[in-house]
Design a protein with these regions (language model features):
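Sequence context surrounding c-type heme c attachment/ligation sites in exported
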Residues: 2-7, 16-155
């Protein structure tokens, strides 16, 4: 009996650890639901040489107004001419996001990411429609700069 109890406790601790530690992953066609965990490629370690940016957001918004925004990144292993350069995931706490072309996809009104057609670039243009009421809005942007060689060395 003691051996079973010990085995059950070890299994419970292992499962709890897997659930408690957020995993980060990425796919060539994008991935939804990573606003907290972020994304990386082939288990690569996140790098502070990759600098994400969001352009086009106002300091203060007008209710229900639509803004053109550009999400992009600089740095990391991504190089012009790579088959794949990277991707992104953007989440907004309020308002609604929309895609402008086939390089990005809408997961839900608060969440958008790159598509497989859009993983050969480092910049994507989207739209964000502000909420109809006065409220604080948070944005979480994750980007993934990759080598495109699929070998796990730097993405």
């Amino acid at each position: 009996m003691r051996r079973r109890a010990k085995g059950a406790i070890i299994a419970l601790v292992a499962v709890s650890a897997m659930l408690a530690i957020p995993s980060a992953q990425s796919l060539p066609g994008g991935i939804a639901g990573v606003q907290q965990a972020g994304c990386n490629c082939h288990g690569a370690v996140p790098s502070d040489t990759v600098v994400p940016s969001i352009e086009g957001l106002p300091e203060s918004y007008n209710y229900s107004e639509t803004y053109n925004i550009t999400v992009s990144f600089e740095g990391g292993p991504s190089q012009e001419g790579n088959v794949n350069q990277g991707g992104f995931h953007l989440w907004a706490s309020k308002g609604s996001l929309a895609v402008n072309d086939a390089t990005a996809q809408l997961y839900n009104e608060n969440e958008v990411g790159h598509t497989e057609a859009g993983n050969d670039q480092v910049s994507w243009t989207l739209t964000w429609t502000a909420p109809a009421t006065d409220t604080n809005v948070d944005f979480i942007l994750h980007v993934n700069s990759v080598t495109g060689n699929a070998d796990g060395a730097g993405g």
